[in-house]
Amino acid sequence: MTTFTRRGLMALLLTLSAGLHAQTPANPQVKFVTSAGEFVVELAADTAPNTVENFLGYVKSGHYTGTVFHRVINNFMIQGGGYDAKYQEKSTKAPIKHEGVEAKAKGGLRNTMGTLAMARTNNPHSASAQFFINVKDNDFLDHQAPSGQGWGYVAFGKVVSGMDVINKIKQTPTGPGGPFPTDVPQTQVLIQSATLVK
């Protein structure tokens, strides 16, 4: 083997090795510390890679620190990640493409109790930073077809510890708050930090 070929092969191996280390782990975990307690979510990067990458970008930038759970509906879900403690909407990156078709084809997570999904508007490709955690099985939110209500919501993670904290949050009395007429916790639930732990 010539010196040139050896050097080329070594460079290729180093490049591939560096690329492997830069990839997101198959199941990264994020720890949330809130005013109601701590919980950890495990993300499904294998079935919803773009959604997970987007979410981790917000985690790593510190976006979620200082945001609140602004929408809490017992027997449905708790939603946060978009508003600060004064109910001012935080700026976000461009929205991401809905990944429901791909996630479903890969046997991805469904909207069952304890799963994490991206919130969005009526536009299926409008998810950015806001997320919700299902507090019951909400199969009607699952992706069915790429049209109308069939788009559903992409579940991309699940709570692996601290479900008692989620259950505590879901039982918080709600009412009006900021620009919202209903469903706002009357005792504010603040996200103090969100950090990648695995």
Predicted regions and their residues:
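Conserved phosphate/oxyanion-binding catalytic-loop motifs
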Residues: L9
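Cyclophilin-like peptidyl-prolyl cis-trans isomerases
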Residues: T2-F4, L13, L20-K198
